[in-house]
């Protein structure tokens, strides 16, 4: 039985939640998000809270209710406050700059990499070695950050590469002769 599903999601002021059949739409100051709800979960919107109840007899219904509750909570937080992910470039000559809606990355390859940002994600480069991604969809922000990090993940010997701002890179000692 999911403990997560038992906690209702409160709807803050300025956020509008509508349920049409199995489609949940959340609109707020930062934008709007839509998600199709699993058939094993019943969603009830009343008195400024969203409750999630499993369908009787459905296999894994409590687990789906907990997952749905977490996803909807991320939608509500995203449209009201937004999400942000910071990346740091560590290495000699590693640079990032914004070119329109693209990020131009110099990561030690023989050519610069151009990463196109999807709709719903905005980027900012406060310095040449920092990237800040912002948006309303938490999953999309994490996906874009993982794609950029995937170009040059941090290596354990010198720590060079693209890393999340809060990431601790485990360092290894060089081989001794």
Curated annotation (Swiss-Prot):
It comes from Shewanella sp. (strain MR-4). Gene3D superfamilies: Ribosomal protein L6, alpha-beta domain. This is Large ribosomal subunit protein uL6. One of its GO terms (cellular component) is cytosolic large ribosomal subunit. It comes from the Bacteria. GO terms for biological process: cytoplasmic translation. Part of the 50S ribosomal subunit. Belongs to the universal ribosomal protein uL6 family.
